[in-house]
Design a protein with these regions (language model features):
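Short N-proximal segments of mature Sec-exported proteins
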Residues: 17-72, 76-80
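Generic signal for short, ordered secondary-structure residues
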Residues: 15-16, 38, 85, 92
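Compact alpha-helical subdomains of small soluble proteins
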Residues: 52-123
């Protein structure tokens, strides 16, 4: 009796993989990042004072890398700032915890954006 050759599992075709993340996704992620940064900026200054410009400075770097989205990014930053300002009028442990959560969320978004850049020639 002859042995049948083993069949290799078929690899999914390129078209069966998840669709490439397009410009709309990218723009949405940038806006979400700007909202997160705006919120984190407010929370940081309400707790540590106006001299702490860490998240505003980071936002400026994003805008410098993506100047075509300047208006959207500034609007998002300001919206995030106002949202957190309405929720956290004073600094307490909850305020500090929310800033840490926003920092983690912003990091996840930034990593996703970097992964997109790493997979393309867009820089």
């Amino acid at each position: 009796a002859q042995q049948q050759p083993r069949r290799q599992p078929q690899q999914p075709a390129q078209t069966e993989q998840a669709p490439a993340r397009g410009e709309d996704w990218y723009r949405g992620q940038l806006v979400e990042l700007s909202e997160v940064l705006g919120g984190a900026h407010y929370l940081r200054i309400v707790c540590d004072g106006r001299g702490d410009q860490r998240w505003r400075t980071y936002m400026r770097g994003v805008i410098e890398r993506e100047p075509q989205y300047n208006g959207l990014l500034v609007e998002g930053f300001n919206r995030g700032y106002r949202q957190e300002e309405a929720r956290f009028p004073v600094c307490d442990q909850t305020t500090r915890q929310m800033e840490a959560e926003l920092r983690a969320r912003g990091l996840r978004i930034a990593q996703g954006l970097r992964a997109r850049h790493a997979g393309s020639n867009v820089h």
